[in-house]
Amino acid sequence: MVSVFLSTLLLAAATVQAYLPAQQIDVQSSLLSDPSKVAGKTYDYIIAGGGLTGLTVAAKLTENPKIKVLVIEKGFYESNDGAIIEDPNAYGQIFGTTVDQNYLTVPLINNRTNNIKAGKGLGGSTLINGDSWTRPDKVQIDSWEKVFGMEGWNWDSMFEYMKKAEAARAPTAAQLAAGHYFNATCHGTNGTVQSGARDNGQPWSPIMKALMNTVSALGVPVQQDFLCGHPRGVSMIMNNVDENQVRVDAARAWLLPSYQRPNLEILTGQMVGKVLFKQTASGPQAVGVNFGTNKAVNFDVFAKHEVLLAAGSAISPLILEYSGIGLKSVLDQANVTQLLDLPVGINMQDQTTTTVSSRASAAGAGQGQAVFFANFTETFGDYAPQARELLNTKLDQWAEETVARGGFHNVTALKVQYENYRNWLLDEDVAFAELFMDTEGKINFDLWDLIPFTRGSVHILSSDPYLWQFANDPKFFLNEFDLLGQAAASKLARDLTSQGAMKEYFAGETLPGYNLVENATLSQWSDYVLQNFRPNWHAVSSCSMMSRELGGVVDATAKVYGTQGLRVIDGSIPPTQVSSHVMTIFYGMALKVADAILDDYAKSA
């Protein structure tokens, strides 16, 4: 009788555990925080950074029980820290907390500094971002192979990997009626990362449909699925949320199913400072990393096969530079002996954001978000001839100016990038600007120029990785076309807010409001943008994946040129910006790189 009772009790407990929300699982206590537990040990792979790509690759590698992986993360397991992370509607509330790296830029245009938001904790920036789920244009990914020489990096290949990551939920009838659209052929359903419509249970605002009707009258397509390879027009978008409307960050998606594997160890509260090498006849070979918290307290740990850098576009370049890989001028200034000459930390491309916001009438009440991916002509409107003239006459000048400012190192190679972007905008109908509209008592557009011509940099300033001294310099708006594009997109948002079907719900502008005259010129908008922009926090390309001749740091398998056993596997490697939010790309990229790593492992076994 006691045995039956105990069995029943255990079954009930197991059932309760199965239905407990993920946020109640005590993951951190199962992870490592004592560095002495791993110091001096040898693993097959060491991953520096437990963000989106780091956790994805760790999970894929450790599916093979023979492969032993160590992930070293500066932060901790934060996914169970309440609504500030779990609730996608709480976006922005986490900024400035211990989960936000909050890097400070060098003084930029108008002598302004800006904060760069990036996640600190297992899950990385998926803990703090807006969890938007879109994909780029086919021609953008195809250019990685056709223009930059990265064999296998084309839309068809990446599309399959991106779908492989995804577990999509189709919209409900009510969500479809509100303005969602879903093309099942463009989605995966058997992946790990859940995606679906954001829905707080409140009535839907009619403003999304009003925006669609307004732009449709102008010839713009509406209700598109922005995951099919040509994002243009207006639609509602998907988000990384589960069926309970809880954020599905990378820790929930990849760590929760894998953290108890005996061949996976996660060390938290420590940062990787530099890569350890031994010299071989074939060049420097990565054999481990030095990690810790300060110059006096740090440790070595060793890798039998590879070191994988996944610390993000702002930090992975710094780890390379601290390790002696980078431009000689940068390393000399920081008193680091150069091991290998590569253009690390340059070509960094981030976008800029401004906001146009208005009050909504009572008739516009309700929840909802919609996105307008506008092409070149739609963004610039009457100013399109002026913008086209710049693209057709200024590329040489821009390339020379960018190299002179330290944003890139080779004028000829940079012009290849610029010509690629010009082709996208003028010949391929690629989305140039994103206007992200949020409702609930307002008509709020956050908007950004998706395709920047500015090139920034991030470099170390000392030889001590634990002093955290570096210069993050996005060089925003040092290219005239970027400023013109941001101004035009801002003007477009204001124009749309109070015209066509949107008029019914417009109840007065709050931003820019009285700070900018009603019929402002593009020049006046440019002045406003310079005083009121913020970074978009989508930086890529600081360790570019392209041919070495064009300025690449890593090859098509993410291996650092001139080394053995070292890859960069994060958002610093895409060679271009894209007309999309970046999570889908990073997940697909991580799965593709994981396969390349496993292929090499199989050959070495």
From Swiss-Prot:
Stored SUPFAM superfamilies: FAD-linked reductases, C-terminal domain, FAD/NAD(P)-binding domain
Biotechnology: Glucose oxidase of Talaromyces flavus is a major factor in biocontrol of verticillium dahliae, a soilborne plant pathogen which microsclerotia are 100 times more sensitive to hydrogen peroxide than propagules of many other microbess.
Keyword 4Fe-4S found: no
Name used for this protein in its record: Glucose oxidase
Top-level enzyme category: oxidoreductase
Catalytic activity: beta-D-glucose + O2 = D-glucono-1,5-lactone + H2O2
An annotated GO cellular component: cytoplasmic vesicle
MF term (GO), any: beta-D-glucose oxidase activity
PROSITE patterns per the UniProt record, alphabetical: GMC_OXRED_1 (PS00623), GMC_OXRED_2 (PS00624)
Binding-site residues for FAD, renumbered to this chain: 52-53, 73, 125, 129-130, 132, 272, 571, 583
Upregulating conditions: Expression is induced in the presence of glucose but not xylose.
Disulfide bonds: 186-228
Compartments it resides in: Secreted; Secreted, Cell wall; Cytoplasmic vesicle
Signal peptide residue numbers: 1-18
Glycosylation sites: 111, 183, 190, 335, 375, 410, 519
Enzyme active site: 538
